[in-house]
């Protein structure tokens, strides 16, 4: 990929690719990034053990910044996860245990490390400073700098109240905690840039303002557009559920298929955001029409899957899509999965079959599916997926859960 030098306007590149919604000081930030390596942070509350494609825009933005020589920080909200960000939510989140939070932190860090190079000090937990600050101390350090009148004007809070949904004091204080996070990261790690979705604008502004009022460093904020697909669905979801970046939650094949099946209108935009192709090539692919646009969708699927799961997984998924589904569908409308008689004679099991075609991520995932009754041949549950398949499988329907069904076809 082409990486801009510090003398070039990195912000212009990010704007061209569609990463920028708002900046607290666009020209000041451009000059700050051009002046030398800066430290930027992206924060996640540890509400799940993986991230999904709705988070991918931030990961790619951080990747571009690191490629340009800047330092990434991953802030995990070990403390704020106990509260939950009320931004544009109608209800509070359930409270997690410490063990659940730690397991989620470990999972998020694994996903993050596939997109940026993490060092020993790249992962930060805000429990490091929030767990030790007393209530009265926090009010003195932070609370006195904020007006309730102004906080009530922020969209995230105002919309919640306008809908007459309850907003606890615990949640109301979240924005102050996030502002404090930014100031502490500036003080402890020299961090000067916070990244976030457009719904985080108020929280980011509060951090910038808090640093100014306390006489700290000049801080910057950059928000990304909140992504939705052209058919109106929130990015991160599919008809089958969340599109996770962790192979244990979603098989690489299904991840690849998500991108391959995207709306024609989204191809150019997604290539700019979720691949590292030069923009000239992005524009060429995005301008393709009709059947030729499928070429661009395959490029997108390969690029996104290679970043999330590695080149091998991307190739396996692409090969599976070509080999398994190349002949279209039978009268039933189900995809056809081909099996060679020679491979079957070698003792091929359902577990082997699903792994070889990258339809399931691991043997344990296949066994869990079978144990839950979700793996069936012509409607009959398969209790032991490791048993070699018999020759009578030709024409049978293989079901994985309630929504994924395939026809098996034997070939010489």
From Swiss-Prot:
Cite the GO molecular-function annotations of the record.
ATP binding; RNA binding; tyrosine-tRNA ligase activity
Q: Which reaction does it catalyse?
A: tRNA(Tyr) + L-tyrosine + ATP = L-tyrosyl-tRNA(Tyr) + AMP + diphosphate + H(+)
Where, by residue number, does L-tyrosine bind?
41, 174, 178
The record places domain S4 RNA-binding at 348-411
GO CC, alphabetical: cytosol
Sequence motif 'KMSKS' region, residues: 234-238
Question: Where can this protein be found?
Answer: Cytoplasm
Q: Where is this motif: 'HIGH' region?
A: 46-55
Q: What is its EC number?
A: 6.1.1.1
Per UniProt, the keywords (alphabetical) are: Aminoacyl-tRNA synthetase, ATP-binding, Cytoplasm, Ligase, Nucleotide-binding, Protein biosynthesis, RNA-binding
Q: Which PROSITE patterns match?
A: S4
GO terms under biological process: tRNA aminoacylation; tyrosyl-tRNA aminoacylation
Residues annotated as binding ATP: 237
Primary location: cytoplasm
Quaternary structure? Answer: Homodimer.
Instruction: List the HAMAP family.
Output: Tyr_tRNA_synth_type1
Per the record, the similarity remark reads: Belongs to the class-I aminoacyl-tRNA synthetase family. TyrS type 1 subfamily.
What NCBIfam families does UniProt report for this protein, alphabetically? tyrS
| Record function comment | Catalyzes the attachment of tyrosine to tRNA(Tyr) in a two-step reaction: tyrosine is first activated by ATP to form Tyr-AMP and then transferred to the acceptor end of tRNA(Tyr).
Tell me what this protein is called: Tyrosine--tRNA ligase 1
């Amino acid at each position: 990929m082409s990486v801009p030098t510090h003398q070039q306007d990195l912000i212009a590149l990010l704007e061209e690719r569609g990463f920028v919604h708002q900046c607290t000081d666009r020209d000041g930030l451009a000059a700050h990034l051009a002046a030398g390596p800066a430290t930027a942070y992206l924060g996640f509350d540890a509400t799940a053990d993986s991230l999904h494609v709705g988070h991918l825009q931030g990961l790619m933005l951080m990747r571009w910044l690191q490629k340009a020589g800047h330092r990434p920080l991953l802030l995990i909200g070990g403390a704020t996860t106990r509260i939950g960000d009320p931004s544009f939510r109608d209800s509070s989140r359930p409270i997690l245990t410490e063990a659940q939070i730690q397991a989620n932190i470990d999972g998020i860090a694994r996903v993050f490390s596939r997109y940026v190079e993490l060092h020993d000090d790249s992962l930060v937990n805000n429990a490091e400073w929030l767990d030790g600050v007393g209530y009265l101390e926090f009010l003195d350090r932070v609370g006195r700098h904020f007006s309730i009148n102004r906080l009530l004007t922020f969209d995230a809070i105002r919309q919640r109240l306008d809908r007459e949904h309850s907003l606890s004091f615990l949640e109301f204080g979240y924005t102050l905690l996030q502002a404090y996070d930014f100031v502490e990261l500036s003080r402890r790690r020299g961090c000067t840039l916070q990244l976030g979705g457009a719904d985080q604008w108020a929280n980011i502004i509060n951090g910038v303002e808090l640093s100014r009022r306390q006489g700290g460093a000049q801080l910057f904020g950059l928000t990304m557009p909140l992504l939705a697909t052209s058919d109106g669905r929130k990015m991160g979801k599919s008809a089958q559920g969340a599109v996770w970046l962790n192979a244990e939650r979603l098989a690489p094949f299904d991840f690849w298929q998500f991108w391959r099946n995207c709306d024609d209108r989204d191809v150019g935009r997604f290539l700019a955001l979720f691949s590292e192709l030069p923009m000239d090539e992005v524009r060429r692919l995005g301008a393709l029409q009709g059947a030729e646009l499928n070429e661009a969708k395959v490029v997108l699927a390969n690029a996104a899957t290679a970043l999330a799961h590695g080149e091998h997984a991307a190739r396996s998924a692409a090969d599976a899509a070509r080999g398994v589904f190349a002949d279209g569908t039978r009268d039933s409308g189900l995809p056809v999965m081909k099996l060679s008689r020679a491979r079957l004679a070698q003792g091929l099991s359902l577990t082997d079959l699903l792994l070889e075609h990258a339809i399931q991520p691991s043997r344990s995932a296949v066994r869990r599916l079978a144990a839950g009754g979700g793996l069936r041949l012509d409607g009959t549950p398969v209790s032991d997926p490791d048993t070699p398949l018999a020759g009578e499988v030709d024409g049978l329907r293989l079901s994985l859960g309630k929504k994924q069904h395939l026809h098996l076809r034997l070939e010489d």
